[in-house]
Amino acid sequence: MAAASGYTDLREKLKSMTSRDNYKAGSREAAAAAAAAVAAAAAAAAAAEPYPVSGAKRKYQEDSDPERSDYEEQQLQKEEEARKVKSGIRQMRLFSQDECAKIEARIDEVVSRAEKGLYNEHTVDRAPLRNKYFFGEGYTYGAQLQKRGPGQERLYPPGDVDEIPEWVHQLVIQKLVEHRVIPEGFVNSAVINDYQPGGCIVSHVDPIHIFERPIVSVSFFSDSALCFGCKFQFKPIRVSEPVLSLPVRRGSVTVLSGYAADEITHCIRPQDIKERRAVIILRKTRLDAPRLETKSLSSSVLPPSYASDRLSGNNRDPALKPKRSHRKADPDAAHRPRILEMDKEENRRSVLLPTHRRRGSFSSENYWRKSYESSEDCSEAAGSPARKVKMRRH
């Protein structure tokens, strides 16, 4: 059988079969090595060029990189500014619930006395959903000035506002001195801001030429938030996202200095006043702060020394225009920007329009109606016949 198959010996047949198996195994190993080499080359090519086939994907990635870097840069800038703001803020919880209740009862007494007219004229400043009560020192701001803008604020003459109530010294200032928040004798100006739900105050910086730093405030009645770096837009009212929103709890003390007090604005947003809230602001006026020296600014007859009294240092004090609102606010008043405190549109109109057209005195519609009626009365009294006036359309 071995001879028929061409092999003379069975050992020769086995030997020939072994060599063939070795050849097949060697072929498989070579193929595997070749496949591994191809895979390695493909991986190297992929690492050198992430998208070797589709150029559109690579182009999209290149285009999106600058956008992502700009966004990241803006976020870094915002975080850096927020860090600067935080560096100028100190907060502490000093007043217990019982102490808050005592102080809040005193604030209610201030409101009651103001409603009875027991304070000086410049002590009380009313606005829809927000009343301010100045003690010790008061100053002009916002629509009260003929020339508006930073640096135009002036202190009232001494005695034009009431003295700081004794309870503010005993219940508030003394506790701050004991905890070394402020030094003894630092405070000579106390302002109580009383907010109703939806009330607000637009972004501002406390006048640097009027007040020393730090600025100390104590919150009562409810929790709220103090926002930094917001931009207000009116009609309809909108408020941009703040650089930093600082929670302000009932009974907490907030101290502003440095960047937080001088380099960025702060505000109270309408959405952050959900319940009645009051804040007592304690400050010290600068020795060189400009001051109004005359006590009868609205009088038509002025003393001969008025011109010299108007001067405070090298600054001439602008005439005051009393523009206070005594209207009671309805619940929707916060959404009517025309009556908000320091309304920019109102300020612009009062500067551009002539005196008889300004809304602070009376509406233009009522003015022209009254003028027309008075002219008719005069013509009838004089006995002159009525004239027909042809109105020209423009």
UniProtKB/Swiss-Prot annotation:
Coiled-coil residue windows: 67-116
Result of altering residue 69 to A: Does not affect sumoylation
Alphabetical list of SUPFAM superfamilies matching this protein: Clavaminate synthase-like
Phosphotyrosine PTM sites in chain numbering: 71
Keyword terms, alphabetized: Acetylation, Coiled coil, Differentiation, Dioxygenase, Disulfide bond, Iron, Isopeptide bond, Metal-binding, Methylation, Nucleus, Oxidoreductase, Phosphoprotein, Spermatogenesis, Ubl conjugation
Compartment list: Nucleus speckle
Modified residues annotated as N-acetylalanine in this record: 2
Effect of residue 267 to A: Does not affect interaction with RBM3
Induction remarks: By hypoxia, directly activated by HIF1A. Expression is regulated by PRMT7.
Cofactor binding remark: Binds 1 Fe(2+) ion per subunit.
GO cellular component, one term: nuclear speck
Modification note: Phosphorylated at Ser-87 and Ser-325 in response to reactive oxygen species (ROS), promoting sumoylation and inactivation.
Cofactor: Fe(2+)
Catalytic activity: an N(6)-methyladenosine in mRNA + 2-oxoglutarate + O2 = an adenosine in mRNA + formaldehyde + succinate + CO2
Signal peptide: none
GO function terms (MF aspect): 2-oxoglutarate-dependent dioxygenase activity; metal ion binding; molecular condensate scaffold activity; mRNA N6-methyladenosine dioxygenase activity; oxidative RNA demethylase activity; RNA binding
Annotated phenotype, changing residue 235 to Q: Mimics acetylation; promoting RNA demethylase activity
Modified residues annotated as Phosphoserine in this record: 64, 69, 87, 325, 361, 371, 374, 384
Activity regulation note: RNA demethylase activity is inhibited following sumoylation. Inhibition is relieved following desumoylation.
Covalent cross-link Glycyl lysine isopeptide (Lys-Gly) (interchain with G-Cter in SUMO2), where: 328
Any GO BP annotation: mRNA processing
Subunit structure, as described in the record: Monomer. Interacts with RBM33; promoting desumoylation by SENP1 and recruitment to N(6)-methyladenosine-containing mRNAs. Interacts (when acetylated by KAT8) with PSPC1; interaction facilitates recognition of N(6)-methyladenosine (m6A) mRNA.
Protein name (record): RNA demethylase ALKBH5
Organism, as annotated: Homo sapiens (Human)
